[in-house]
């Protein structure tokens, strides 16, 4: 293994399946913990905002969600950085890596402009959708603070989460993300309540704390990357290249659209569940929260697959690229199967983390939530499969067809099926969740089939070149 965690294609034979599994797990583990740390920051914000009352929680929560959606969609464009670096390293063309890094850095700053603009108009946008004036004003104030975090988020999360794993430096994400949870909690409490000698800013203190934490995270990651001699040659000073920026954007924009298609599916499902009543919505939120936590692991495996498939594809080793992808798919399905088994075996224990099971007022929600967790056990397996499959295809720089597959699966199959089950078959929230499962299953099958075809074709082309 090289110091950065990749077997050099020119120096060693392609790895065995067990080595693929070990290397993928080693790369995915810090990414999963970093993503769980980001979720922990969100939970911290929610808990501390809740101490100010429901109005502050509603405004802060909506403002944070709005910011998260906008920035996450734009971060999708930057996923192109990881696969481009992986291809360059696999092809033993590491002199290209600094050009990719600095072009990606410039692209991050450019993407921050629409993020800043959208968050600046949060209040009029909410008013246009008929939200109450007081809520729209408070959300607008919250988003106006968070907009200043957009450049830091696109650099610290978008760029660094793509670049660092591709050069074998994923562990830096882990430690900095864990530290960020503590810093965010300290600043949130201090700025909300005026503790520790900090000014008391009320609910805007949470937005200020999050903004500061995001910038500290970005600055720390950049400093660690540039200051470590092992990685300094990857970031040697060079000018961004416009043609390369076009290439990165061309690979990345379909990923951003895919993120948007998936996000709107879950948003629409949540709004539709809300029509069925408070108990249904509460049960839906519990099941979705549990599924979201488990999803961080296959999401990280998909990011690792992106890098490893890209590396071996760049190295001209199509069999190794294919094996890297299918091993990652196996790991994702295996983890989500175990996670699903937990949901089947102990649904009441899980729901008990959110609600008092012996409270009669919660009885209907508890029954429905445990039922949804049973569906989530199936839902999780195909959800993990589709996100890892998407990562494998990104490793082959194949993003446009997966985008179309997501559109078809989520909105052509998933939501219509769920709506029919919910309101015509009388299954209610359970029907909507079966629709989600159907949509995710169709996308998972399409992604896996596409990777099978693309990776096999890559091998055929390599054989043809060898014979020529």
UniProtKB/Swiss-Prot annotation:
GO molecular function: antiporter activity; xenobiotic transmembrane transporter activity
Highest taxon above the source species: Bacteria
GO biological process: monoatomic ion transport
Regions crossing the membrane: 57-79, 100-122, 142-164, 173-195, 205-227, 248-270, 280-302, 323-345, 360-382, 401-423, 433-452
Cell compartment(s), UniProt: Cell inner membrane
Keyword entries, A-Z: Antiport, Cell inner membrane, Cell membrane, Ion transport, Membrane, Transmembrane, Transmembrane helix, Transport
Principal localisation: membrane
InterPro entries in the record: MATE_fam, MATE_MdtK, MdtK-like
Database matches in CDD domains: MATE_NorM_like (cd13131)
Stretches of the chain forming a coiled coil according to its record: none
UniProt similarity note: Belongs to the multi antimicrobial extrusion (MATE) (TC 2.A.66.1) family.
Listed name of the protein: Probable multidrug resistance protein NorM
Source organism of this protein record: Burkholderia pseudomallei (strain K96243)
Lineage, top ranks: Bacteria, Pseudomonadati, Pseudomonadota, Betaproteobacteria, Burkholderiales
């Amino acid at each position: 293994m090289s110091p950065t965690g990749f077997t050099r294609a020119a120096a060693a034979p392609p790895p065995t399946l067990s080595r693929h599994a070990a290397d993928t797990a080693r790369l995915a583990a810090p990414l999963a913990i970093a993503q769980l740390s980001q979720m922990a920051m969100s939970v911290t914000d929610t808990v501390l905002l809740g101490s100010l009352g429901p109005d502050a929680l509603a405004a802060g929560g909506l403002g944070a969600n709005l910011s998260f959606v906008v920035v996450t969609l734009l971060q999708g464009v930057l996923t192109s950085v990881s696969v481009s670096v992986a291809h360059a390293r696999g092809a033993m063309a590491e002199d290209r890596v600094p050009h990719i890094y600095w072009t990606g850095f410039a692209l991050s700053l450019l993407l921050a402009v629409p993020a800043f603009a959208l968050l600046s108009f949060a209040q009029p946008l909410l008013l246009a959708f008929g939200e109450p004036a007081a809520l729209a004003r408070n959300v607008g104030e919250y988003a106006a603070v968070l907009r200043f975090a957009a450049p830091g988020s696109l650099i610290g999360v978008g760029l660094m989460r793509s670049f660092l794993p591709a050069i074998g430096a994923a562990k830096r994400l882990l430690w900095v993300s864990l530290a960020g949870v503590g810093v965010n909690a300290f600043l949130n409490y201090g700025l909300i309540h005026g503790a520790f000698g900090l000014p008391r800013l009320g609910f805007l203190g949470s937005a200020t704390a999050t903004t500061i934490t995001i910038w500290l995270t970005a600055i720390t990651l950049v400093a660690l990357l540039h200051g470590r001699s092992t990685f300094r040659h990857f970031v040697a000073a060079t000018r961004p290249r416009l043609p390369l920026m076009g290439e990165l954007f061309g690979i990345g924009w379909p990923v951003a659209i895919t993120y948007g298609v998936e996000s709107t599916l879950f948003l629409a499902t949540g709004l539709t569940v809300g029509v069925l009543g408070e108990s249904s919505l509460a049960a839906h939120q519990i099941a979705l929260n549990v599924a979201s936590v488990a999803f961080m692991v296959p999401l990280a495996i998909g990011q690792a697959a992106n890098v490893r498939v890209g590396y071996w594809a760049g190295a001209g080793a199509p069999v190794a690229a294919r094996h890297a992808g299918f091993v990652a798919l196996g790991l994702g399905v295996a983890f989500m199967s175990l996670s699903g088994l937990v949901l089947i075996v102990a649904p009441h224990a899980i729901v008990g983390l959110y609600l008092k099971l012996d409270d009669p007022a919660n009885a209907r929600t508890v029954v429905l939530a445990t039922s949804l967790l049973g569906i989530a056990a199936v839902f999780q397996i195909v959800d993990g499969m589709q996100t890892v499959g998407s990562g494998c295809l990104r490793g082959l720089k194949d993003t446009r067809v997966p985008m179309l597959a997501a559109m078809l699966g989520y909105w052509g199959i998933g939501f219509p099926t769920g709506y029919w089950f919910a309101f015509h078959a009388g299954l209610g929230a359970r029907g909507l969740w079966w629709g989600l499962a159907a949509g995710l299953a169709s996308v998972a099958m399409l992604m896996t089939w596409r990777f099978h075809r693309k990776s096999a074709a890559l091998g055929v082309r390599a054989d043809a070149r060898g014979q020529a």
